[in-house]
């Protein structure tokens, strides 16, 4: 897919799905700005992706003023992909951790969308958010993550309506079980991994590139009449 000269922002771009998405845009010819939560993450990603046109910057999406300053400072944008997020299994049952997860995953997404609106309007751009299979069902050990991703799904639909008058499309992907650092413990648990693969009609774990390609589609002219969609990318896990 050719996206030459597209101006793209990917938050949470220093690892996992976000890093693959940033790489995919750069390989398609886009000019990519990627963010990471810490300077160490940014340094690692910068070194690993030195051969690509991706410029990484530290950004805490929980800091409203920092998000506004950074995103508005980018000027006009064609695409914003919100991947920044956290998950704190078991700990999210405590109110403080629950609130932090909501703030990063849901409020952080809204902060980036709001800050980017004028820049996207200038180029009739689009937003792709990162929801989850847990947008559709509960997680007993991850109430904050599940609630935040359910919120991202509804935020996506709501902003698709609100931003349509500006010519901005807003969609989301909802990844299933993807092989990333966040799921490494489950991948390394033979019993649990077998259960996941057994329920997935496609019969395997997803890879980050399996998510990156649908994101590129949603951001491309091929999806010019697509907005408000929360697209499962889960190998069929949700239909079982």
Regions found by a protein language model. Give the residues of each.
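Short, small/polar-rich loop/turn modules that mediate ligand/substrate recognition or access, typified
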Residues: 164, 169, 226-228
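Conserved glycine-rich cofactor-binding loop
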Residues: 14-15
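Residue(s) in the substrate-gating loop at a strand-loop-helix junction
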Residues: 132
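Active-site helix of classical SDR
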Residues: 102, 113, 148, 156
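Substrate-binding pocket helix/loop in short-chain dehydrogenase/reductase
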Residues: 89-102, 196
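Short C-terminal tail/terminal secondary-structure segment
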Residues: 137, 215-216, 227-240
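Conserved glycine-rich Rossmann-like NAD(P)H-binding loop of the short-chain dehydrogenase/reductase
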Residues: 28-44
